[in-house]
Swiss-Prot record:
The lineage of its organism: Eukaryota, Fungi, Dikarya, Ascomycota, Taphrinomycotina. This is Importin beta-like protein kap113. Coiled coil: none annotated. Pfam families: IBN_N, Xpo1. PROSITE patterns: IMPORTIN_B_NT (PS50166). It is found in: Nucleus. Belongs to the importin beta family.
Length: 983
C-alpha cells in the first residue's frame, strides 16, 4: 500500500536518524506554501489510528505556523475550505485527543479564536459551552477537562488582544462567560473540599478530576475578572470573585495548616496534594493581578479578608516552620511558596495604601488599621524576627555545601522566590508605613547588638537583630548610636571572637550592615575604620573569611565605595592591601556569578583609585591578560573583563601606552569581523579603543593595523557608529596622515553611504567628524578624494535642490563651509563636473543662514560664502548684495576682539567627541583645544576678512570703476555707504 508523502515525512521527522529528521524538515517547510498542506496535517492529527508521535508532530507543525497562515493575504494563507475544515473539527480535536495532544490543539484553537471570533466563528462559545455542560451533566470529566483547557487558552489569547475593537468584544463576552463558569467553579470546588474536610485517607480518583476541573475553571475566571472589564474596580464580578477566592483560600490554607500541625501522615498525597497547592496559589493570583494591572485593592472589601486569612495562616503554622520540609518532603518548596505568598500579600497591601492614602483616604485608612487589629503588627514583627529572618540549620548546610549559590539566593532582590529577602522586604514596608509605632520595641533591643556573641545560637539571634536594624536604617538612625556601636562593639567583638563559625556569621552580617548604614558614616575617622574592616574581610589567608563572607563583602563593599560619602584619603591608605586581596580572589572562585562580582569590585577600585593605582599597573594588566586568555569559553566573563580594562585605562590614563600591545591584541580580536564573537564584544571593545586613544600622546604602530577593521565598522550603521566616529576623530588628531594618506577616498565614500542611514544626533556626529577631517588634513592630500568621491557632490546637490529638512541641510552646509574656507575653487569645480546649478546652490546657501541657530556657525557660514567671492565666479558675484547683508549681520551681532574671537562663539560641544564626554585631563582634550585656537571662527577677524575679500574682488575685476559697473550697481547703496565707512 502506498504511503502518503506527508505521513512519510512526518514519520521521518520523529525518527532517531538526524539526517532523516533534517531532510524531512526541509520537505515539510517547502510544503507549507502548498495549498491543502495544513488541512492535511490537521486530518492526520484527528485520525486516532495514527501513532501518537505522528499526531503530535502534525499538531506541533500546525501550532507553530498558525499565526502566519491564518492571516489573510499572505503567501502561506489557507484555502477557505481548509479554514472551514479546521474550525468545524477544532472542538472535536480537543474532545477526542489525549490530554497532551488536547493542550496543543487548544493552543491552535485559541489563536484562531483570537482572529475569527465573532465575525468568522460566531458559534464558537455556544458550541464549546454546550459540550462542556453536557459532559459535566453526564459525568464525563475527562472530556470536560479538555474542553476547559481549550476554553482557558481561548480566554488567555483574547485577553492579550490590545486592539480597541477586540477589547470591546472581550468586555462584552466576559460577563456572559462568568455567569456560566462561576457555578461550575463553585460546584467542583465544593465537591473536592467536602471530601478533604471528611479527614479520611483519600484514594478516590474522582477527587483529582474535581480538582483539575476547578483548577482550569478558576484560571479562566481569573483572566475574565482581571482583563474582561474596562474598570475592574467598578465591576461586581471582580468584587465577588475576589471575595469568593478569599473564602475558599481560607478553607484551603486552614486544611494545609492542619496537615502540617497533625502528627499523622497527610491525608492528601501525590498529585492531589500538588493540585491542592496549585489551588492555593491560584486563589491569590487575582489579588496579585488587581494590584499589578489595575491597582484597586483599597476599593475591594475582600482585601481585609485576605489580610486576615494570611495572618491566621502564618499564625497557625508559625511554630511548625522548621518541620514542614520533613512533613512535606516532596512538596516542601510549595509550602515555602505559600509562606512567601502570604508575605507578598502584606507587602502589596501596605504599598497600595501608602500610594492611595491621598486619593482614597478613607479606604486606605481602613487597610492601615487592619494591621493594628489584635496586635497583628507586633505579632508579625515577632514572626519575622524569630522565625523567618533567622538563619536555620538548612542555611548552614547550604552555606557549607554551596556557598556561592547560597549567597546569590540571599542577595537577590526578587522577593517572589526566597523567604528571607521577602521577609526583609515586608519588614522594610512595616518601617515605612508604621515607623512611629514599631520604632519603640527596637529601642529596647539596641544594646543587645552591642553584646559579643559567645555561642552560635547567640550569633544567629544577633544576626537577625542587626539585620532588622539594617533594614530600618531610615527610621532608626535617630536612636541607634552607629559610631559608638562600630568602635565599641563591632571592632572589639570581632577581635575577641575565637570560634570560626561564630566569626563567619558575625562578619557576614557586619559587612551587610555597614553597607546599609554607610550614609550615616560621613566622618573620615569612621570611614577609615569601615574600609579597614572590609579590607580584612577580603583576606583569603584569614580562616574566618570563607566563601560566604568574602562574596557578601564584595557586594557590600562595592555599595560602600559607590556612596557619595567616599573618602579618598582613607581609601588610599589601604589601597595596596585591597588590590592584593582582590586580585588573589580570582583563583579561589569558579562560578560565573562570583567572578563577575569580583570583576565588578575590581572595576570600582580602579575607578576610585584613578592614577593612584601605581605601582600596581603591571600586576593588574598581567592579571587581566591572564583572565582574558583563560576564559575563552566564558563570553560573559570576557565581556566583563573588557569593561574592567576600560576602567583600567581610564584610571592610568597616559600610562596605558605601556600596555598598548596587550590592548591591541584584545581589541583586534573583538572588532575583527571574522572573529566568531565580535558581535558580543564589539561595543565594549570600541569603548576601550576610543578611551585608550583619548589618553595617549602618540599613536602606537600596532594600532595602525586596526585601521582596516575601523573602515569596516565605518560602513555599518549600527549602534556602535558613534564610537567608530569618535575613534576616527582620535586617529586624526593623533596623526593627521595615518588615515587620510591612503584611505581618504574610501572614508569619504563610506561616510556618504551613511548619510541616509543616520538621523538627528548621529548625523551631527557624522558631519562633525567630516569637518574635523577637513580641518586637520593638508588639502593637497584630500583634494582629489573630495573631487572624485560622492560625498561633496551629494552635499552640494542636496543644498542646491533643497531636498532635505532645513536642520539636515544645516549640517551639510557646515561641512561644505569648511571646504569652502580652505579651497573655494573645489566647490565650483565639483558643481561643474556634476552639473549642479551654482546659482541655485548659492541662493539656497544664503537662505539657509536664517535657520542656523548658533552665532559661531553663522560666522563660519558667512566666511565660507565670502571665500567663494575670491573665485570671481559671476554667479557668486551676482548675489554680492545678499552676501554683504550677511557681513553686516555678523558684525552687528558680535563684538569681536582683535583676533576675531568672542565668548559667544564657544559652544557646549566644542570639546566633546561626537557627543561623548571628554576627560578634561586627557591628551585628546589638549589636542582639541589647540585645534580650536586655529579655527577661523576664533582666529579670523570678520571685519578685516570681509574688507580683504571686497578689495580682492575689486582688483580682480579691473578696479573700482569696472567693479561698480559690473556688480556693485546691484548692491543696495545704503550697504555700500556703510561699507565705505569701514574702510
Amino acid at each position: 500500500m502506498q504511503v502518503d508523502p506527508v505521513v512519510y515525512q512526518l514519520q521521518r521527522a520523529v525518527s532517531q536518524d538526524p539526517i532523516a529528521v533534517k531532510d524531512a524538515e526541509g520537505h515539510l517547510n517547502n510544503w507549507k506554501k502548498e495549498p491543502g498542506f495544513f488541512g492535511k496535517l490537521y486530518s492526520i492529527f484527528l485520525d486516532k489510528q495514527n501513532d501518537m508521535s505522528l499526531r503530535w508532530i502534525a499538531i506541533i507543525q500546525l501550532r507553530n505556523s498558525i499565526d502566519i497562515i491564518w492571516r489573510k493575504n499572505t503567501k502561506m494563507s489557507l484555502l477557505p475550505e481548509e479554514r472551514d475544515f479546521i474550525r468545524c473539527n477544532a472542538l472535536l480535536g480537543s474532545i477526542k485527543s489525549e490530554n497532551l495532544l488536547s493542550i496543543q490543539n487548544a493552543l491552535v484553537v485559541s489563536r484562531i479564536a483570537r482572529l475569527d471570533y465573532p465575525t468568522e466563528w460566531p458559534s464558537l462559545f455556544h458550541d464549546l459551552l454546550g459540550k462542556l455542560q453536557q459532559s459535566l451533566g453526564t459525568g464525563d470529566y475527562d472530556v470536560a477537562l479538555r474542553l476547559l483547557i481549550t476554553l482557558h487558552h481561548i480566554i488567555k489569547a483574547m485577553a492579550g488582544n490590545r486592539l480597541l475593537r477586540s477589547r470591546q468584544i472581550f468586555y462584552k463576552l466576559a460577563p456572559e462567560l462568568l455567569t456560566i463558569l462561576q457555578p461550575i467553579l463553585h460546584s467542583s470546588l465544593s465537591s473536592w473540599m467536602m471530601i478533604l474536610e471528611s479527614s479520611k485517607e483519600i484514594k478516590d480518583s474522582t477527587l483529582l478530576s474535581y480538582m483539575q476541573i476547578s483548577r482550569y475553571t478558576l484560571k479562566a475566571c481569573r483572566r475574565l475578572v482581571v482583563f474582561g472589564f474596562q474598570n475592574p474596580s467598578e465591576s461586581e464580578f471582580s468584587e465577588r470573585m475576589l471575595a469568593f477566592c478569599a473564602v475558599h483560600q481560607r478553607k484551603l490554607l486552614s486544611m494545609l495548616g492542619t496537615m502540617l500541625q497533625s502528627s499523622r501522615s497527610p491525608i492528601v498525597v501525590g498529585e492531589c496534594l500538588e493540585m491542592a497547592f496549585a489551588h492555593a496559589f491560584l486563589f491569590n493570583k487575582p489579588f496579585f493581578d488587581f494590584s499589578f494591572y489595575s491597582p484597586c485593592l483599597t476599593k475591594f472589601p475582600a482585601t481585609i479578608d485576605y489580610i486576615s486569612l494570611h495572618y491566621d495562616f502564618l499564625g497557625q503554622i508559625s511554630s511548625h516552620l522548621s518541620s514542614y520540609k520533613e512533613k512535606f518532603e516532596e512538596s516542601s518548596k510549595n509550602f515555602e511558596k505559600l509562606v512567601i505568598m502570604s508575605l507578598r500579600v502584606f507587602i502589596l497591601v501596605i504599598q497600595e495604601f501608602c500610594n492611595t492614602k491621598s486619593s482614597h483616604p478613607e479606604t486606605a485608612q481602613v487597610l492601615y488599621n487592619s494591621f493594628l487589629v489584635d496586635n497583628r503588627i507586633n505579632n508579625l514583627l515577632d514572626l519575622l524576627i524569630t522565625k523567618l529572618l533567622i538563619l536555620k540549620e538548612e542555611d548552614f548546610e547550604e552555606w557549607t555545601d554551596s556557598p556561592q549559590q547560597w549567597v546569590l539566593e540571599q542577595s537577590t532582590q526578587d522577593v517572589e522566590f526566597n523567604v528571607r529577602p521577602c521577609a526583609e522586604k515586608l519588614l522594610k514596608c512595616f518601617f515605612d508605613a508604621y515607623g512611629d509605632i514599631i520604632v519603640s520595641p527596637f529601642k529596647d533591643m539596641i544594646y543587645s547588638v552591642f553584646e559579643c556573641p559567645k555561642t552560635l545560637t547567640q550569633a544567629v539571634q544577633q544576626d537577625t537583630l542587626i539585620s532588622s536594624f539594617g533594614v530600618g536604617y531610615t527610621q532608626l538612625k535617630s536612636i541607634f548610636p552607629f559610631a559608638k556601636w562600630l568602635q565599641e562593639a563591632a571592632v572589639p567583638n570581632m577581635a575577641s571572637i575565637n570560634d570560626i563559625g561564630i566569626s563567619r556569621v558575625y562578619r557576614r552580617r557586619i559587612a551587610i550592615f555597614l553597607s546599609q548604614w554607610i550614609e550615616d558614616s560621613s566622618s573620615e575617622q569612621l570611614l577609615e575604620v569601615i574600609y579597614k574592616l572590609y579590607c580584612s574581610f577580603l583576606n583569603l589567608t584569614d580562616p574566618c573569611n570563607d566563601a560566604v563572607v568574602i562574596l557578601t563583602t564584595i557586594d557590600a563593599f562595592k555599595t560602600v565605595l559607590d556612596d557619595w560619602n567616599f573618602s579618598e584619603n582613607s581609601f588610599l591608605s589601604i589601597k595596596e592591601n585591597l588590590f592584593v586581596h582582590v586580585l588573589s580572589l580570582f583563583k579561589a572562585f569558579e562560578s560565573v556569578d562570583a567572578r563577575t562580582s569580583i570583576l565588578s569590585l575590581l572595576g570600582t577600585l580602579l575607578a576610585r583609585a584613578g592614577e593612584h593605582v601605581a605601582p600596581m599597573e603591571s600586576t593588574i594588566a598581567s592579571l587581566l591578560s591572564q583572565l582574558w586568555d583563560g576564559w575563552k569559553k566564558e563570553p560573559l566573563l570576557r565581556a566583563r573583563v573588557l569593561a574592567v580594562m576600560h576602567q583600567f585605562v581610564n584610571a592610568i590614563k597616559a600610562k596605558s601606552f605601556e600596555f598598548s600591545t596587550f590592548l591591541y591584541t584584545v581589541i583586534e580580536y573583538c572588532v575583527n569581523p571574522e572573529s566568531p564573537e565580535h558581535v558580543i564584544f564589539e561595543a565594549d571593545a570600541m569603548e576601550l579603543w576610543s578611551t585608550f586613544l583619548m589618553y595617549i600622546q602618540k599613536l602606537p604602530e600596532t594600532f595602525t593595523l586596526l585601521i582596516p577593521h575601523l573602515l569596516y565598522h565605518l560602513s555599518q550603521a549600527t549602534s556602535t557608529l558613534p564610537f567608530v566616529l569618535m575613534i576616527v576623530s582620535s586617529y586624526q588628531l593623533l596623526d593627521n596622515t595615518v588615515l587620510m594618506k591612503d584611505y581618504s577616498f574610501t572614508i569619504f565614500e563610506k561616510l556618504n553611504d551613511l548619510l541616509d542611514d543616520v538621523k538627528n544626533e548621529t548625523l551631527q556626529a557624522l558631519c562633525k567628524t567630516v569637518c574635523l577631517l577637513i580641518e586637520t588634513t593638508p588639502m593637497d592630500m584630500i583634494y582629489e578624494s573630495l573631487l572624485n568621491s560622492s560625498l561633496l557632490s551629494r552635499l552640494l546637490l542636496s543644498i542646491a535642490t533643497n531636498d532635505k529638512h532645513p536642520q539636515v541641510l544645516i549640517e551639510y552646509l557646515l561641512v561644505v563651509s569648511r571646504i569652502s574656507l580652505r579651497e573655494p575653487e573645489l566647490i565650483l569645480k565639483v558643481c561643474q563636473t556634476k552639473n549642479i546649478n551654482i546659482a541655485m546652490l548659492i541662493g539656497n546657501w544664503i537662505l539657509l543662514n536664517d535657520h542656523i541657530n548658533h552665532s559661531k556657525d553663522r560666522k563660519l557660514n558667512t566666511l565660507a560664502l565670502s571665500s567663494l567671492l575670491r573665485t570671481n565666479h559671476p554667479d557668486v558675484l551676482a548675489v554680492l548684495d545678499s552676501i554683504m547683508n550677511l557681513w553686516f549681520s555678523v558684525l552687528s551681532e558680535v563684538e569681536e576682539d582683535a583676533n576675531g574671537d568672542a565668548t559667544i562663539y564657544y559652544k557646549n560641544d566644542d570639546y566633546s567627541a561626537v557627543g561623548f564626554y571628554l576627560d578634561e585631563t586627557s591628551e585628546e582634550m589638549t589636542r582639541r583645544k589647540q585645534l580650536l585656537l586655529k579655527d577661523p571662527v576664533h582666529s579670523v577677524n570678520s571685519r578685516s576678512f570681509f574688507i580683504s575679500v571686497f578689495m580682492f574682488c575689486r582688483d580682480a575685476n579691473g578696479g573700482m570703476e569696472n567693479f561698480q559697473n559690473q556688480y556693485l550697481s546691484t548692491v543696495n547703496p545704503a550697504l555700500l555707504e556703510q561699507f565705505q565707512s569701514m574702510l
